[in-house]
């Protein structure tokens, strides 16, 4: 029996008190005052937000499990400094842990990181360790541009990131490369910034040789890999011009794309261009695009329909829906095996 595992979910409709505390935290930082205590949020409040949104859609669309992380647009590491980013990340990750505890058969946790633009990765390493070792999380979201749309951080191949990669390898967890909200008025967050960052991340990796130093490091580039599959020939050609090995050798044992692509022709192209072993089912439901496609009558983000419609073998479909995700997230695989799955 095949499981349908969605590798890309965010907690986008949250208890009101959580969002209110965030606004209070930001206001307190601006005023030079300590943030108020985090509010008490009941299990029932969490259940209400999940049952009315992600859990309902998971059941309606025929999936089994979602890998769940904090709301991407609200990670906002560019707000404040480490005194803001660390407690915010902890609060968001703790909320994800509570969702997983309430619905352990349906959700697995992935953490956000307190990546203030001026900070090194020390606090992020500590939060990753806490979330994996204490909360049972299976991965993280790594922001390649904590400044929010100006791309001033070193490329992902730079040694700035190496201490964090070392911890990822030690814990055997992957990272989804995921930016947050845009503070650049020329760059719409979900329509421009997300897709640009996905593409930029891939090109950064192409220009270096990161996986020679970290052969077991694993990255998921979301939103179908940005522009990469559509311009696969360009990237193959650039690798050749830069005297790099082929993409299959240089990157594609370590880099994976999800299926957060919101129309059938786009998914068809992804599956045609990218090797089956590198594609993970994802939807980012109740996320960037929440409406119904008037040409199909179905939600744009109901990506399972697109995978179901692909002209591929049952074995290839199983790999996209389950097998690849269990391979990329070995801690999830261990949890499922412990349940006899």
Curated annotation (Swiss-Prot):
Disulfide bond entries: none
EC number: 4.2.1.-
Mutagenesis or variant effect for residue 284 to Q: Loss of enzymatic activity
Pfam annotation, one family: Amidohydro_2
Pathway: Secondary metabolite metabolism; lignin degradation
Keywords: Aromatic hydrocarbons catabolism, Lyase, Metal-binding, Zinc
Catalysis performed (reactions): (3Z)-2-oxo-4-carboxy-3-hexenedioate + H2O = (2S)-2-hydroxy-4-oxobutane-1,2,4-tricarboxylate
Top-tier EC class: lyase
GO cellular component, one term: cytoplasm
Gene Ontology terms, MF aspect: carboxy-lyase activity; hydrolase activity; metal ion binding
Nucleotide-binding among keywords: no
Binding positions (Zn(2+)): 8, 10, 178
Protein's UniProt keywords contain Lyase: yes
Residue sites binding substrate per the record: 71-73, 194, 223, 290
Cofactor(s) for this UniProt protein: Zn(2+)
Gene null: resulting phenotype: Cells lacking this gene catabolize vanillate and syringate with an accumulation of the enol form of oxalomesaconate (OMA), 2-pyrone-4,6-dicarboxylate (PDC), and a product that is likely to be KCH.
Active site: 284 (proton donor/acceptor)
Cofactor binding mode and count: Binds 1 zinc ion per subunit. The metal center contained within the active site of LigJ is not used to activate the water molecule but is utilized to activate the substrate via polarization of the carbonyl oxygen.
One record GO biological process: lignin catabolic process
Family according to the record: Belongs to the metallo-dependent hydrolases superfamily.
UniProt subunit comment: Homodimer.
Protein name as annotated: 2-keto-4-carboxy-3-hexenedioate hydratase
Species whose genome carries this gene: Sphingobium sp. (strain NBRC 103272 / SYK-6)
């Amino acid at each position: 029996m095949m499981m349908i595992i969605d590798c890309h979910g965010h907690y986008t409709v949250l208890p009101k008190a959580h969002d209110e505390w965030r606004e209070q935290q930001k206001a307190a930082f601006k005023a030079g005052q300590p943030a108020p205590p985090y509010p008490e949020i009941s299990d029932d409040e969490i259940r209400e937000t999940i049952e009315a949104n992600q859990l309902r859609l998971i059941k309606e669309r025929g999936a089994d499990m979602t890998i769940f992380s904090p709301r991407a647009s609200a990670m906002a590491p560019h707000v404040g400094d480490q005194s803001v980013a660390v407690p915010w990340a902890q609060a968001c990750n703790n909320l994800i842990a509570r969702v997983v505890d309430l619905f352990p058969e349906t959700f697995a946790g992935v953490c956000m990181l307190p990546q203030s633009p001026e900070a090194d990765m020390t606090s992020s390493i500590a939060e990753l360790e806490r979330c994996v070792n204490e909360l049972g999380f299976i991965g993280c979201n790594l922001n390649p541009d904590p400044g929010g749309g100006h791309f001033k951080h070193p490329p992902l191949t730079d040694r700035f990131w190496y201490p964090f990669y070392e911890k990822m390898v030690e814990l055997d967890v992957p990272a989804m490369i995921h930016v947050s909200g845009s503070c650049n008025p020329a760059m719409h967050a979900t329509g421009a910034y997300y897709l640009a960052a996905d593409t930029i991340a891939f090109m950064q990796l192409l220009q270096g040789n990161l996986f020679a130093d970290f052969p077991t490091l694993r990255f998921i580039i979301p939103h179908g890999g940005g522009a990469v599959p559509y311009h696969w020939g360009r990237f193959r050609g650039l690798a050749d011009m830069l005297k790099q090995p082929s993409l299959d050798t240089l990157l594609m044992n370590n880099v994976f794309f999800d299926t957060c692509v919101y129309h059938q022709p786009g998914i068809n192209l992804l599956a045609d261009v990218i090797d089956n072993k590198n594609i993970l089912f994802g939807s980012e439901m109740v996320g960037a695009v929440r409406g119904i496609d008037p040409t199909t009558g179905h939600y744009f983000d109901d990506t399972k329909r697109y995978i179901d419609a692909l002209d591929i073998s049952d074995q290839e479909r199983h790999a996209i829906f389950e097998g690849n995700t269990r391979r990329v997230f070995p801690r999830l695989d261990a949890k499922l095996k412990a349940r006899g799955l």
